[in-house]
A protein has these predicted regions:
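Helix-adjacent hinge/juxtasegments
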Residues: 63-103
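Alpha-helical segments flanking ligand/cofactor-binding loops in enzyme cores
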Residues: 38, 65, 69, 91, ...
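C-terminal binding/interaction regions
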Residues: 22-24, 28-29, 107-169
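Short, Lys/Arg-enriched N-terminal segments with co-localized hydrophobic residues
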Residues: 5-18
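Glycine-rich phosphate/diphosphate-binding loop of Rossmann-like nucleotide-binding domains
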Residues: 22-42
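A short beta-strand-loop structural module common to alpha/beta enzyme folds
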Residues: 46-57
């Protein structure tokens, strides 16, 4: 679960603790990654850049795994992973135990991924969303809080499946 670092929905908590956010991307998302890094740094977050900075073709699973491992290990509080559609990089991130990566192409889904699924990695596609939409998605995702309650039970069930599949039960 994410520490109490996320701003309240009512516009924000001025005493908010800033976070360390891992970001990874493939060659399709270099420009968008830099836009998101700038946004995160403007908001006072520390950014761990685990993506490529060149547009030379590369393999998105490498970067999804890097972001997932940074989050799962506690090296980062949250992660953002960007490829062409957000789909492939999310599949790779979700292979890391403890990661709940969600693909979000608009703010509502981003908010709900945090509120109901306690998503710890946000994924989206550089070929799907423009820079302004991407910034809105990131801001809304960071501002949302996990609601717990019945949603905690459901997240626990998801994590139970993961433990079984990893041979821990």
């Amino acid at each position: 679960m994410i520490p109490e670092k996320i701003r309240a929905e009512d516009g924000g908590d001025p005493e908010r603790t800033e976070m360390k956010i891992a970001i990874g991307n493939d060659h399709t998302a270099v420009e968008l990654k830099h836009i998101i890094v700038d946004l995160l740094e403007e908001k006072g977050h520390t950014v761990l850049n685990l993506g490529t900075d060149t547009e030379e073709s590369c393999d998105y699973p490498v970067y999804g795994e890097r972001v997932g491992r940074a989050v799962a290990s506690g090296q980062a509080d949250l992660g953002i992973a960007i490829c062409g559609t957000g789909l492939g990089i999310s599949l790779a991130a979700n292979k890391v135990q403890g990661v709940r990566a969600c693909v979000c192409s608009e703010p509502y889904t981003a908010v709900m991924s945090r509120r109901h699924n306690d998503a710890n990695v946000l994924c989206f596609g550089a070929r799907v969303v423009g820079s302004e939409m991407a910034k809105m998605i990131v801001e809304q995702w960071l501002d949302a809080e996990f609601e717990g309650g019945r949603h905690q039970r459901r997240v626990d069930l998801i994590m139970e499946i993961e433990r079984r599949e990893c041979g821990e039960e």
